């Protein structure tokens, strides 16, 4: 499944508007002294838009994916202009410098880090077909390298995973980072993720799916874990692991979540949960045996969740529109 041209046009329109919109802005910034002239664009010249830093990163990823799939989009030239400005050597140097500041070692760890790596993976995939994508990838490389190294240190240090359905999920971060590691040829990162995933999740059995979702989830802790294990385990080993992890099937994970208020920034996460469940299930299905009776059921549930979340990806309140289209793009296919 791919993003059709009509959807891509709408997604591009929303992403362009968001990545260039400086306010409103949710700053995650530790002050070590008087703030001075603290504006989003001055602090983060590449990723100042889309409400917060990580959303700005993954909406840039969305733009790259869209022009990769549809080079003739009506907004293609506007996308190139924005990427030229935001993914410049100078802008990325400032983003790198930010991580050297006092108390910033954990800034956007691991979610924002992983999205930078996935953005770089998408640029590298496109670079073989477009010279400007090579230029953008070259500019982003110092930040991607820095965050890949920091992620390696983090996952080596961590004796336990973070098993929640929000930004700090280690499984989600590792899925995106693994894609980057494979595309960029970062064998150390790939190996570290494989080791960590086995350590954290390899013995997991009977996932507590009855406890999902939490009210602000945009990821399923169980499904994103299964999706990561699908990426790192050999097929037969994964199939055996999945039997033990979901011995009674999907249970309540098969039902799209109820979203009580799409103008509430936390509750709007639940539309993202529908989209990320669809993404995870579609990836998991590709590893099931051809005669596995779960294939049709998992696919139908993925379709149900996509139908629940996709209509809300663009055109709604800003608390959803500044990020949801990225997750719709994940659900609609392709790497990672």
Where are these regions (language model features)?
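Low-complexity, Ser/Thr/Pro/Gly-enriched N-terminal "stalk/linker" regions
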Residues: 1-48, 92
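A beta-strand-loop signature enriched in Asp, Gly, Thr, and Trp
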Residues: 231-268, 272, 277
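Loop-centered beta-sheet repeat module
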Residues: 150-223
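Extended ligand-binding groove/face enriched in aromatic
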Residues: 57, 66-180
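Fungal-biased detection of long, low-complexity, Ser/Thr-
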Residues: 258-336
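Well-ordered alpha-helical scaffold segments within catalytic/enzyme domains
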Residues: 1-3, 60-73, 114-132, 173-185, ...
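Solvent-exposed loop and edge beta-strand segments that line ligand/cofactor-binding
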Residues: 3-5, 41-57, 97-114, 157-170, ...
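Extended, well-ordered alpha-helical scaffold segments
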Residues: 4-15, 74-90, 129-154, 186-204, ...
């Amino acid at each position: 499944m791919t993003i059709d041209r009509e959807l891509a046009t709408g997604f591009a329109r929303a992403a362009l508007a968001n990545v260039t919109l400086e306010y409103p802005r949710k700053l995650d910034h530790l002050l070590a002294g008087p703030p001075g002239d603290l504006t989003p664009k001055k602090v983060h010249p590449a990723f100042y838009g889309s409400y917060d830093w990580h959303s700005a990163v993954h909406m840039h990823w969305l733009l790259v994916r869209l022009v990769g799939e549809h080079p003739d989009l009506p907004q293609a030239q506007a996308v190139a202009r924005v990427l030229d400005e935001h993914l410049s050597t100078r802008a990325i140097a400032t983003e790198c410098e930010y991580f050297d500041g006092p108390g910033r070692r954990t800034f956007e760890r691991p979610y924002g880090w992983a999205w930078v790596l996935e953005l770089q993976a998408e640029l590298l995939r496109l670079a073989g077909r477009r010279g400007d994508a090579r230029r953008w990838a070259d500019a982003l490389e110092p930040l991607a390298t820095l965050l890949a190294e920091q992620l390696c240190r983090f996952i080596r240090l961590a004796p336990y995973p973070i098993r929640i359905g929000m930004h700090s999920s280690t499984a989600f971060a590792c899925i995106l980072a693994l894609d980057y590691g494979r595309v960029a040829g970062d064998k150390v990162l790939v190996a570290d993720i494989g080791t960590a995933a086995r350590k954290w999740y390899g013995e997991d059995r009977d996932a507590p799916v009855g406890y999902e979702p939490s009210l602000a989830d945009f990821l399923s802790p169980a499904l994103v874990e299964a999706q990561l294990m699908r990426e790192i385990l050999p097929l037969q080993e994964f199939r055996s692991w999945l039997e033990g992890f979901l011995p009674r099937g999907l249970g309540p994970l098969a039902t799209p979540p109820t979203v009580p208020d799409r103008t509430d920034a936390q509750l709007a996460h639940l539309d993202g949960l529908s989209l990320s469940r669809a993404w995870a299930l579609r990836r998991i299905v590709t590893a099931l045996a051809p005669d596995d009776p779960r294939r049709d059921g998992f696919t139908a549930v993925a379709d149900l969740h996509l139908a629940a979340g996709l209509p809300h990806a663009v055109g709604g309140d800003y608390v959803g529109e500044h990020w949801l289209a990225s997750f719709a793009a994940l659900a609609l296919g392709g790497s990672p």
